[in-house]
Amino acid sequence: MSESKKMPAKKKTTRRNTKKEQQKKAATRKMIAFFVGLLLILFALARLGIVGVLLYNIVRLFVGSLAIVFLLLLAGLMIISVFRKQVLKENKRIIPAIILTFIGLMFVFQIRLHQGFNETFHLIWSDLMAGRVIHFVGSGVIGALITEPAKALFSVIGVYIIAAVLWLVAIYLMIPGLFPKMREDLHQRLAKWKEKHAEKVEAKKAAKALAELEKKQAVAEREELPEAAENSLFTSAPTEIPINIPEAPFEENETESPVLAEVPLDDEPVNFSNTNNYNGNYKLPTIDLLAEVPVKNQSGERENVRKNIGILEETFKSFGIGANVESAVVGPSITKYEIKLATGTKVSRVVNLSDDLALALAAKDIRIEAPIPGKSLVGVEIPNAEVAMVGFREMWEAGKTNPSKLLEIPLGKSLDGGIRTFDLTRMPHLLVAGSTGSGKSVAVNGIITSILMKALPSQVKFLMVDPKMVELSVYNDIPHLLIPVVTNPRKASRALQKVVDQMEERYELFSRYGVRNIAGYNEKVQRYNAESDEKMLELPLIVVIVDELADLMMVASKEVEDAIIRLGQKARAAGIHMILATQRPSVDVISGLIKANVPSRIAFAVSSGTDSRTILDTNGAEKLLGRGDMLFKPIDENHPIRLQGAFLSDDDVESVVTFIKDQSEAQYDESFDPGEVDESQVGTGASNTGSGDPLFEEARNMVIMAQKASTAQLQRALKVGFNRASDLMNELEAQGIVGPAKGTTPRKVLVSPDGEFIGGVEE
């Protein structure tokens, strides 16, 4: 019995000891698990050995490149749960706030990756199998699973908004009193603003009431005055009328224009051009005639820009070039990335990487501007995914050209969105070249339309040469034309020579009146007309437009080149300006002499760097995209400027031309008429020589009747170029009609007017 009584006592003691031991064992296991977990986290964070890299990649599989953040948060929560458990019990919102913040980060990291679920898993799995950590993998498999549906439903911007909302909610959970405090501050500021606004309104009401009171007092005092005083008040009232004149400045022009219109009628014996007759009723074309081109939203390019910045920096780094993208400017057709190079990097190394950068960016073509003028940066111009068309109406409205500058023309939109204009009077001549379909003809039509929308027919005249017969024929019969559009290349050289003769006549006129240019002459005419009853007409500006220079150079190269060179050298002061366009920019068309006298150039897309150097003296045009993409090199710039030309449809041109034709008829100037040209007169680029020249008999008779002979005399009388006149003179000498040349004196004529041979040639 004693043994049976002792046994239960031993069992009770054993049960009591087992509970304590279990608690100790549980605490021990918990601490062991804590330290083992913390040790594994440290191995994973430091990527120590194969185990550390493996653990880190396993975490990356689920949360991607946020593995470091996840492991640090996990370690922090473990430490708090073991040593500061009370903190989590008192602040139950901390864990939900951390989870929301982490989910927002997962959205952002996965969007930055620009990859889907399969690509993300492949990148992580390749690193896991290779035992390395190389690629940026977004937010892992979990991030891809939650981001891809959100991106499909709400777009990229929507995902960013969701992430921002999650972060705001997390901030609210962690700092509950923050938003109420902000709301109170906002209410206080609104209350202060309302008080100030109410005070201003009350002050205005008080001032208005005071003004009405003073007005009533003035009326009461006026009623008490005698009639004489009342009459005196009414007589002085008209002195306030001139104050309103500056508010309507256009009324002055409307009153002056009929006077200008009546000038030729008062002075009928003077047989001047009648261009001023319709200036009084002539109205300039309005912007409403042009169609609006919808403005394209380019916000979608931002994502491409961010992606390209990373590719550019990585590509430069792979070639051993230290470079950082300072800024990116999105233009209508291209985006320009401004890149800062590391000190000591040669610019030539960057220029030579053009093809490699195009390959990395998967771009059609890129242009490198090294360096950017005025900056210590290199520009890399990359085509946009979609081109934003620039409308001519939009450019005209934004350009805001000076109405007094008749030849100031909006040309195109620059990279920063600004409108670039140029004044043809300062150029003073312009060469436009580019391959077929590059936008050359649209640019020429834009220049002509810009002038037509600003200038009266008496202010600007055109002489147009269009051997293709389809580009400029739409402008026939407008009152701004000197003669109908010249389509025969054989007549074009004569028409250009007529312009040269007009230039010489203007210089003789300037010399007679003691002025230096057309502006001084017209100013003198204005003063004379203001002081005298007899009226003189101002000289108009003349714009010569040749749409296809190559065709003219094939038919009569010497005569055309001579006329262009003479106009290029002297025509600016005479108010004559040229626009030469060609789609074949070769050296036999754009010769060195033509380039020297036409300093301002526009290059559209060409096929080779050789053509680009022919136009601009530098490479670059071969990298253009076409459809209005141009390089503009004015006379006052050393480097070409890239612009996107405006689109002007044929319907818009037709609308403007029809509006002008409906107002007045064309009145051509016969002095510019090239006349009829015999097909046998002009060879293939060189002047005719020998007795087969049809003008030989006319030259022979003219020399015999005048009894003096010189090449300049033949040029003026026969309206031919210098080479042809020289050949005629040599033939006259060979047939014994004139003597040999003796310096600058005219040659002696050896045949009398009666046909007798005089002879007497001095040795």
UniProtKB/Swiss-Prot annotation:
Membrane topology qualifier: Multi-pass membrane protein
Where found in the cell?
Cell membrane
Q: Where are the residues of the annotated region Disordered?
A: 1-24, 668-693
Instruction: Report the main location listed first in the record.
Output: membrane
Q: Which residues lie on this side of the membrane: Cytoplasmic?
A: 176-763
Source domain of life is Bacteria
Q: Is the keyword Transport in the record? A: no
Please list the GO biological process terms of this entry: cell division; chromosome segregation
Which portions of the chain have biased composition (kind: Basic residues)? 7-18
FtsK domain ranges (all copies): 416-613
**Any GO molecular function:** ATP binding
Question: Where is composition skewed (Acidic residues) in this entry?
Answer: 668-679
Bias class Polar residues marks the residues at: 681-691
Detail which positions bind ATP.
437-442
Gene Ontology CC:
plasma membrane
Q: Which UniProt keywords apply?
A: ATP-binding, Cell cycle, Cell division, Cell membrane, Chromosome partition, DNA-binding, Membrane, Nucleotide-binding, Transmembrane, Transmembrane helix
Q: What is known of its domains?
A: Consists of an N-terminal domain, which is sufficient for the localization to the septal ring and is required for cell division, followed by a linker domain, and a C-terminal domain, which forms the translocation motor involved in chromosome segregation. The C-terminal domain can be further subdivided into alpha, beta and gamma subdomains. The alpha and beta subdomains form the DNA pump, and the gamma subdomain is a regulatory subdomain.
Q: What does this protein do?
A: Essential cell division protein that coordinates cell division and chromosome segregation. The N-terminus is involved in assembly of the cell-division machinery. The C-terminus functions as a DNA motor that moves dsDNA in an ATP-dependent manner towards the difSL recombination site, which is located within the replication terminus region. Required for activation of the XerS recombinase, allowing activation of chromosome unlinking by recombination.
Its assembly, as annotated, is: Homohexamer. Forms a ring that surrounds DNA.
Return the protein name.
Answer: DNA translocase FtsK
List the source organism: Lactococcus lactis subsp. lactis (strain IL1403) (Streptococcus lactis)
